[in-house]
Amino acid sequence: MAQEKVFPMTHEGKQKLEQELEQLKTVKRKEVVERIKIARSFGDLSENSEYDSAKEEQAFVEGRITTLENMIRNAKIIEDDGGSNVVGLGKTVSFIELPDGEEESYTIVGSAEADPFEGKISNDSPIAKSLLGRKVDEEVTVQTPGGEMLVKIVKIS
């Protein structure tokens, strides 16, 4: 039997997934069923684009529900040790690109809750992999899609 994948995430990240799951099960699922019902009332299903669209959305919603249930069931909550001065999951790390770049900050989270637009990067990302286990004032070479860059860690919280 294959071992289930573990999804490291913060408590906040798990709560967001639980909220999304609840919304899909209680609201979205009902909306899609209603769309299917209305589309069926149009008659012939063989050329009914509304019906096809609603069935596709239903498949997507059910797939997302299954994915979320799996992620929540296999979540491993990252405990913040509070005092660590080492970059790790759940930590926010600030760094500057050397020699004279601007400061950037990211929170390193599990892949399930990564959202670069919110400043949350996956622990599997090249930047996070380069920073994990490092300390303030360390200079680190980071692999990016645009090539290598040298950064200096200025803060971990």
UniProtKB/Swiss-Prot annotation:
InterPro entries: GreA/GreB_C_sf, TF_GreA/GreB_CS, Tscrpt_elong_fac_GreA, Tscrpt_elong_fac_GreA/B, Tscrpt_elong_fac_GreA/B_C, Tscrpt_elong_fac_GreA/B_fam, Tscrpt_elong_fac_GreA/B_N, Tscrpt_elong_fac_GreA/B_N_sf. Keywords: Coiled coil, DNA-binding, Transcription, Transcription regulation. It comes from the Bacteria. Residues 10-76 form a coiled coil. Gene3D superfamilies: Transcription elongation factor, GreA/GreB, C-terminal domain (3.10.50.30), Transcription elongation factor, GreA/GreB, N-terminal domain (1.10.287.180). The keyword Oxidoreductase does not apply. GO terms for molecular function: DNA binding; RNA polymerase binding. Pfam families: GreA_GreB, GreA_GreB_N. Disulfide bonds: none annotated. PANTHER family: TRANSCRIPTION ELONGATION FACTOR GREA (PTHR30437:SF4). HAMAP family: GreA_GreB. Belongs to the GreA/GreB family. Necessary for efficient RNA polymerase transcription elongation past template-encoded arresting sites. The arresting sites in DNA have the property of trapping a certain fraction of elongating RNA polymerases that pass through, resulting in locked ternary complexes. Cleavage of the nascent transcript by cleavage factors such as GreA or GreB allows the resumption of elongation from the new 3'terminus. GreA releases sequences of 2 to 3 nucleotides. This is Transcription elongation factor GreA. It comes from Bacillus velezensis (strain DSM 23117 / BGSC 10A6 / LMG 26770 / FZB42) (Bacillus amyloliquefaciens subsp. plantarum). The gene is greA.
